[in-house]
UniProtKB/Swiss-Prot annotation:
Keyword Transferase attached: yes
EC number, UniProt record: 2.1.2.10
Organism: Leptospira borgpetersenii serovar Hardjo-bovis (strain JB197)
Subunit structure as annotated in this protein's UniProt entry: The glycine cleavage system is composed of four proteins: P, T, L and H.
Gene of this entry: gcvT
Catalytic activity: N(6)-[(R)-S(8)-aminomethyldihydrolipoyl]-L-lysyl-[protein] + (6S)-5,6,7,8-tetrahydrofolate = N(6)-[(R)-dihydrolipoyl]-L-lysyl-[protein] + (6R)-5,10-methylene-5,6,7,8-tetrahydrofolate + NH4(+)
Name of the protein: Aminomethyltransferase
GO biological process assignments: glycine decarboxylation via glycine cleavage system
Keywords, comma-separated and alphabetical: Aminotransferase, Transferase
HAMAP family named in the record: GcvT (MF_00259)
Protein function: The glycine cleavage system catalyzes the degradation of glycine.
One example GO MF annotation: aminomethyltransferase activity
Amino acid sequence: MSQVKRTPLYETHRALGAKMIPFGGWDMPVQYSGIIAEHNATREAAGLFDVSHMGEIFITGEPKIVLDFLELVTCNSVASLSDFQVQYNAILNENGGLVDDVTIYKFSVEKYMICSNASNYETVTAHLLKYLPASGVKVSDQSPNWHQIALQGPKANEIFSKFLGRELDSIKYYHFALLDYQGEEIIVSRTGYTGEDGFEIYSSIPFGLKLWSGLSELGKPQGLLPCGLGARDTLRIEAKYPLYGHELNNQWTPIESGIGWIVKEKKNPYFSSGKILSQKKNGTEFKIVAFALTEAGVPRENFRVLDFQGNEIGKTTSGTFSPSLKKGIGLASIRTEKIKDGEPIQIEIREQPKQAIITTKPFIPGSIRKN
């Protein structure tokens, strides 16, 4: 059995009284003061998350060869990216399933960075190396050299701007900047996984520790709290964001996973592009949708979804009690013909059918500043 890894902030989490759990091969904080308090702090003020377990994989080389390589293994259009733009994308396997969902950072025509999930970045690196051209492209997993934290919430911009001593409004949603702070170059990305405005900040490990401490102290009067994986999960479900291993896996295509909006037609074919584009046009048997309970109950993963005749039409993939809505919500893979906004369904919780409705609208408005 491989040894559980610890982030550079492990001792800080212990000192803060965090409850630690294994996640994706890492020992991570699930909560500090409490999931609901941390969730609400992020929605109303700011939350600080240790995400240094994520992977950073750099792709460099000759511009055309690099671009062609990235276009082959992904479904979104990397060619559409401008310098210093970020893109949500998926690394595909040969059958159109997801090796991982990722964000791709374009520094220049010669340099890109892929941010991958903690449990997958070694798999992603191996997959990329498997299909690497004979020359012209280099793939480098630099995850051990980077520290990443996320500052999220409606007050994130105010807090981080004050910390840096400069405005950050020029960094638009899903864009990033290379900033110099006291001689340290950091990557500041206006992205996140909460449905709120905020930043994901990449730096050296020593600076990352200072950044966590400085932001914690500066943000505390504003209501900032350190947040664990528990709040990260409730926040992302409210935002209808998928999680690998739940809504996403190596069998389901992007269409079946509910992220069909990132599937694009490209100049050249990519892995299973014929199959995936056909699904986008003609539909699939199952698809990920969101639902909300209309009576008391807390849904979890792998609960049966029923129609009102009692027929099984799918399974839940994620579920939680929503601190913002104060009711049970979740995501599920269900038969496509049953997907309609407001359609009544049932979620079987402890062998008891609980009434729910499908919702295609956002659960929460959030504070994201779209460009």
